[in-house]
Amino acid sequence: MFRDIIIKKYTLGAIRMTQTNATRIEKDTMGEMEVPADAYWGASTQRAVLNFPISNIRYPSDFISMLGRIKRAAANANQQLGLLDPEIAKSISAASTEVIDGHWDNHFVVDLFQTGSGTSTNTNANEVIAKRAREIADGLNIHPNDHVNMAQSSNDVIPSATHLTAAKAIKDELIPALEKAQKTLIEKSNEFWEVIKTGRTHLQDATPIRLGQEFQGYASQIELSIDRIKPHLSALSEIALGGTAVGTGINAHENFARAACEILSKELSLPVKETAHHFQAQGTQDAMVSASGAVRSIAIALQKIANDLRWLSSGPRAGLAELELPTVQPGSSIMPGKVNPVIPESVVQVVCQVLGNDAAISAASQGGYLELNTYWPVSAYNLHQSITLLASATSNFDIQ
């Protein structure tokens, strides 16, 4: 199950569309570009596809969905303020809803390792939504920048989508997984309470301890991990939307961000609000670094639990053999009957990945020069991956 989840979320593979060599001509400010005839993106996105043939890694679908939410909220906010024609807003909203639901994921084609502002992916969203909105509106003139991107810039949209994608994953995936694991550990603590065993410090025998007390310690680790991550929901729900290019809010109505944030807050059940510190929000990744640190601490807590279970189940004849872990698969191709602690081992490997992701986020956060940090895509991907990996690994650890 765990492996399947990772494949769905991260092995995005090639773009699957109708196989055809037909193209059409699209134009942007730099001139004409050939674009696949059945593609919903335009010239600027196609330039980015050609510029960045790096990894075949894309922004995760959760991020693309959040971009759709921001575009829909922006269209509705601009309509409320009398800035966007109601029919255009309605069509953009409908097209954005399809993006939210994942119908156009195969048309988000820009590599993750692109311009550090994420402009190419924001442009990709604007072009896909505009083309689909024109179809919905039966040919009404809807422009990617003038209408879909109204009152926005990549420099505030991408940081906002990055924050909210992480916050939503923490709320909907990580915290529930941790809460279930904590409940299981408390149950095991009660079950094992009467078992007295040798305590160990420095891996050497020490004074007696209840097995239930050891599991009580594990449950407390998870409880405190939840307490540490929850404050980051508020920090990540404070977004840069409304700052536009450099944080001054140029070309955006003064009430635009507030209106859009109210919409997003209701949809996501998060305390979404416009930041009071636009220059900080676009020029730094401070909230990302802090949240990643909390995620890292959760990972290390899980590593402690996983490694303890490996030690306590070691053997079965020449080890500690105080616990027996569920037998889930054969452990060796050469030693019949051998069974290994494969589930805890998978957890520890997830921890290794999370620690690497945290290091990458720390490095990317140092790319905040003057009015913009220019390494948003790699931080967005790594924090989201850390959160979802830990959620999946924790759930699997609990279930197995």
How should these model regions be labeled?
Residues F2, G13-Q400:
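Conserved, well-structured ligand/cofactor-binding cores
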